[in-house]
């Protein structure tokens, strides 16, 4: 544990070093794929409105929270406090669980699309499912490495 602490691996980056450290580099990809999920769900038709509502909530919530955390890390609002490492790990674990549930529900709703939907609408939903699973993977990887950082802090 001492080498990680000595090299700064157990603290959060600030400034533009956020874009050069792993797992914080994943913020960019979470932002991109989360935005794509948000756009695709907003423009697609889902046979079960409750599912679309949950997927929209998850994508908008995670998009906004990821953006807020990214901006706060860039401006250095954490000040090197260990509580921010805990917040980072907790947020990414919750976001990973939320996105996993949203991805599964969106996939289930897309599979259930049969009659009354065009080929284009079906493909929009398939794209939303794929990007949702990519976002889930990104959040899971970020959560795992955030938990490792939290444990070493």
UniProtKB/Swiss-Prot annotation:
Cysteine-cysteine disulfides: none
InterPro entries reported in the protein's UniProt record: MAL, Marvel, MARVEL-CKLF_proteins
Cytoplasmic side: 1-24, 76-92, 148-153
Residue ranges crossing the lipid bilayer per the database entry: 25-46, 54-75, 93-114, 126-147
Biological-process GO terms, alphabetical: myelination
Keyword Transmembrane helix set for record: yes
Extracellular side: 47-53, 115-125
Protein localization: Membrane
One cellular component term from this protein's GO annotations in UniProt: membrane raft
MARVEL domain residues: 18-151
A Pfam family recorded for this sequence: MARVEL
Mode of membrane association: Multi-pass membrane protein
PTM (free text): Lipoprotein.
Record's keyword annotation contains Hydrolase: no
Main location group: membrane
Gene Ontology molecular functions: structural constituent of myelin sheath
Keywords annotated in UniProt: Lipoprotein, Membrane, Transmembrane, Transmembrane helix
Function: Could be an important component in vesicular trafficking cycling between the Golgi complex and the apical plasma membrane. Could be involved in myelin biogenesis and/or myelin function.
Membership in a protein family: Belongs to the MAL family.
UniProt protein name: Myelin and lymphocyte protein
Name of the coding gene: MAL
């Amino acid at each position: 544990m001492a080498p990680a602490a000595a090299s700064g691996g157990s603290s959060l980056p600030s400034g533009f070093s956020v874009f050069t450290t792993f797992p914080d580099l994943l913020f960019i990809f979470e932002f991109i794929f989360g935005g794509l999920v948000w756009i695709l769900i907003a423009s697609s038709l889902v046979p079960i409105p409750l599912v679309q509502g949950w997927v929209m909530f998850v994508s908008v919530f995670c998009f906004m929270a990821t953006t807020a955390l990214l901006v706060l890390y860039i401006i250095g609002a954490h000040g090197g406090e260990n509580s921010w490492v805990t917040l980072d790990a907790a947020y990414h674990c919750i976001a990973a669980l939320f996105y996993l549930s949203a991805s599964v529900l969106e996939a289930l709703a897309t599979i259930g699309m049969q009659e009354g939907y065009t080929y284009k609408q079906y493909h929009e939903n398939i794209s939303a499912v794929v990007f949702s699973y990519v976002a889930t993977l990104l959040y899971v990887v970020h959560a795992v490495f955030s938990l490792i950082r939290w444990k070493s802090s």
